[in-house]
Each structure stands twice: as C-alpha cells, then as structure tokens.
C-alpha cells in the first residue's frame, strides 16, 4: 500500500505542477492582451522611412480599428491569398476568414502613409501552443506598391520584439509550401525554422499537407526553454 500511495502522491504532485505551469503561461498571455499599445516602449519602431517609403506604424486591437480598416485588411488578404488557399486542402472560406480577422483576440500592426491610408498590416495574437506562450502571426500582407522595400521584414522584426518584450517564447506562423516566395522569405531572410508541431515534423500527415508551421524563438524563449507535453491550442479563453 505504501508504494501505491507514494505513486499516487507523485502523480498528483506532477498534475499540480503542470497546472501551475500552465496557469503561469496563461497569465503571461492575459497580461500581453491587456496592453494598450505593445509599441509604446519602442517608439523608434513607430515609423518606417527607408527605400522611398515614409510610413507610420501602429499596433491596435481589432476592436480599436474602424470597420473600413478591417474591411481593407480583409480585401487585401483575399486579393493576395485566395488563389493560394484554393490550391490547398483548406480552400477559401470567406465567412471563416472574416470571423478570424474580426475575432476580439486579434491584434493588428498597421503601416499607414502620410494621409493615414493603410498600406500594409500584420494580424497576430498572443496565444498558447503546446504549452508555450507564443505570438502567432496570422497574416502579413502588403499592397503591391510597398513590396520589396524591406517593409515586410520590418513588420516581422517588430513582432519578434513585441513577443520578446511580453515574454512570449516564440513567434509562430503558418505558410503554404506552394507559396515559394513567402516560404523562402521566412526560412532564409528571417531564419524561421520548421516548428516541431508542423505536420512534416509531427508525423500526422507529413507530405500530404500543403503547409508548414514555422517558428523562431525569442531571446526570452531561448533562455527559458520549452514546456514539454503541454496542450496544443489556446488555453486562456
């Protein structure tokens, strides 16, 4: 009876430790979501004036954006991505994409010109993936006239800084394998790696999947390590 009792106590203790660790992870995500402006401590990144561009950068919750701005973001995403979605097993689903982009958890990093016209954006969220607190980048979309000027890389670098400052362990995103330019951009220019949760790594469907999940650890994440065995998916809502 003594050995059984000890095993039960150890099992209970492990559960308590795992729950405490997950509570700490969710507390960080909740704290990040309560920020008014994640860029407030990084004013130097609130403008982009390189390669002929002079843009203002802002970071807001979707609830703080005008309906016109959200509609512009959707239409730009549709124009840039619909064909790529239709070439995948997902297909293009307008209602689902609109709901995703309007979800109250959504944050937007926006680049506007001198007339306040939006020209590029990233939709991201603070969330939990497999026990880790992460910044998940859902979209990074640019109008054609501001592409190939370093702006996309700049926006992703801002996301990495925001992730580190809010103690997220990594920046994650999903990219289609057949979107060769984007795949090369993230893997080579930004040094993202194929995440351990990606189908090709986890063995769930591998080569049959049209996408990879990529990630890059923050400085905070490199120091703090990984919470193995955590639940995959959001836990804080």
Curated annotation (Swiss-Prot):
Binding of substrate, residues: 85, 127-129, 138, 174, 211
N-myristoyl glycine lipid modification positions: 2
Keyword Cytoplasm attached: yes
Keywords: Acyltransferase, Cytoplasm, Lipoprotein, Myristate, Nucleus, Transferase
Site (Essential for catalytic activity): 139
UniProt binding sites for acetyl-CoA: 140-142, 148-153, 179
MF annotations from Gene Ontology: histone H2A acetyltransferase activity; histone H4 acetyltransferase activity; protein N-terminal-serine acetyltransferase activity
TM ranges: none
Entry EC no(s): 2.3.1.257
Principal subcellular localisation of the protein: cytoplasm
Subcellular locations according to the entry: Cytoplasm; Nucleus
One term under GO cellular component: cytoplasm
Alphabetized Pfam families for the sequence: Acetyltransf_1
PROSITE patterns on file: GNAT
Highest taxon in the source lineage: Eukaryota
Catalysis performed (reactions): N-terminal L-seryl-[histone H4] + acetyl-CoA = N-terminal N(alpha)-acetyl-L-seryl-[histone H4] + CoA + H(+); N-terminal L-seryl-[histone H2A] + acetyl-CoA = N-terminal N(alpha)-acetyl-L-seryl-[histone H2A] + CoA + H(+)
Ranges for domain N-acetyltransferase: 63-216
Family statement: Belongs to the acetyltransferase family. NAA40 subfamily.
Function statement: N-alpha-acetyltransferase that specifically mediates the acetylation of the N-terminal residues of histones H4 and H2A. In contrast to other N-alpha-acetyltransferase, has a very specific selectivity for histones H4 and H2A N-terminus and specifically recognizes the 'Ser-Gly-Arg-Gly sequence'.
Name of the featured protein: N-alpha-acetyltransferase 40
Source organism of this protein record: Danio rerio
Lineage of the organism: Eukaryota, Metazoa, Chordata, Craniata, Vertebrata
């Amino acid at each position: 009876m003594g050995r059984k009792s000890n095993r039960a106590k150890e099992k209970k203790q492990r559960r308590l430790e795992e729950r405490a660790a997950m509570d700490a992870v969710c507390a960080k995500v909740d704290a990040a979501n309560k920020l008014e402006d994640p860029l407030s401590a990084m004013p130097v990144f609130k403008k982009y004036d390189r390669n002929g561009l002079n843009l203002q950068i802002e970071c807001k919750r979707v609830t703080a954006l005008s309906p016109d701005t959200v509609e512009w973001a959707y239409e730009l995403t549709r124009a840039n991505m619909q064909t790529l979605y239709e070439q995948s097993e997902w297909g293009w689903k307008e209602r689902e994409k609109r709901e995703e982009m309007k979800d109250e958890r959504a944050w937007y990093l926006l680049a506007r010109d001198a007339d306040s016209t939006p020209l590029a954006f990233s939709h991201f969220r603070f969330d939990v993936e497999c026990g880790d607190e992460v910044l998940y980048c859902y979209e990074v979309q640019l109008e054609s006239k501001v592409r190939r000027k370093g702006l996309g890389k700049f926006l992703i670098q801002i996301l990495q800084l925001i992730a580190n400052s809010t103690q997220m362990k990594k920046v994650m995103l999903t990219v289609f394998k057949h979107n060769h330019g984007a795949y090369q951009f993230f893997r080579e220019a930004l040094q993202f790696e194929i995440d351990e949760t990606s189908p090709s790594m986890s063995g769930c469907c591998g080569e049959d999947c049209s996408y990879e999940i990529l990630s890059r650890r923050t400085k905070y994440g490199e120091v703090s390590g990984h919470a193995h065995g955590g639940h995959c998916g959001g836990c804080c809502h």
